[in-house]
Amino acid sequence: MFKFDNLILASSSKQRLCLLNQLGVLPGEIVIPNIDESPLKKELPKIYSMRVAKEKVIKVSLLYPKKFILGADTVVCCGRKILPKAETEDQAFEILELISGRRHRVYTSVYLYAPSKKLHYRSVMTVVKIKRLSVKEINSYILSGEWKGKAGACNIQGNAGKFVISINGSYSSVIGLPLYETYSILSQYFPI
């Protein structure tokens, strides 16, 4: 693993740091960007994901203009409806009931700000199909608390993994950072 002192991860996500570590990369610093992540009116999920990831990177780059800043955003959607990170058990129940037995899309966008003021980005769409969930299964999952802070109230690395019928696309993207795309961007500047 290589520590890159001139790389900042703009994220509060432990999963993103773990995924970045899988690439052999340890950022010199982690900075949590404080931005408004509310979707704009009629904003499409992919555009939302790209905008929020870019805003995270730009916000941190204003504080550290001479550093590389890596940021990402993951959004889950059913149709054009962006599913929020549930804040209550009732919201988690509604979201899980909505994706139960259906395919839903997960968009993750990753941005890298370079000190030359150049922005690099990639956006990945993955389709996930969840089995039809019983009320008992949903309630049991909610009791686990794993839904907290997760896009779509679903943690496929944990208990929710047993509900996944199929994933068409990038598994790491669903967790929060598309490894191939992140590697492609970072390898332009870092020896990884």
Curated annotation (Swiss-Prot):
Biological process (GO) annotations held by this record are: nucleotide metabolic process
Could you name the active-site residues? 73 (proton acceptor)
Key words, A-Z: Cytoplasm, Hydrolase, Nucleotide metabolism
Q: Which SUPFAM superfamilies match?
A: ITPase-like (SSF52972)
Q: Which GO terms describe its cellular component?
A: cytoplasm
UniProt cofactor(s): a divalent metal cation
Instruction: Respond yes or no to whether keyword Cytoplasm is given for this record.
Output: yes
One family from Pfam that matches here is Maf
Superkingdom: Bacteria
InterPro entries per record: ITPase-like_fam, Maf-like
Recorded E.C. number(s)? 3.6.1.9
Q: Which reaction does it catalyse?
A: a ribonucleoside 5'-triphosphate + H2O = a ribonucleoside 5'-phosphate + diphosphate + H(+); a 2'-deoxyribonucleoside 5'-triphosphate + H2O = a 2'-deoxyribonucleoside 5'-phosphate + diphosphate + H(+)
A GO molecular function term, named singly, is:
nucleoside triphosphate diphosphatase activity
Q: Where in the cell is it found?
A: Cytoplasm
Q: NCBIfam families this protein is in?
A: maf, PRK14366.1
The UniProt function text for this chain reads: Nucleoside triphosphate pyrophosphatase. May have a dual role in cell division arrest and in preventing the incorporation of modified nucleotides into cellular nucleic acids.
Family in the record: Belongs to the Maf family.
**Mind telling me what this protein is named?**
Nucleoside triphosphate pyrophosphatase
- Source organism (scientific name): Ehrlichia ruminantium (strain Welgevonden)
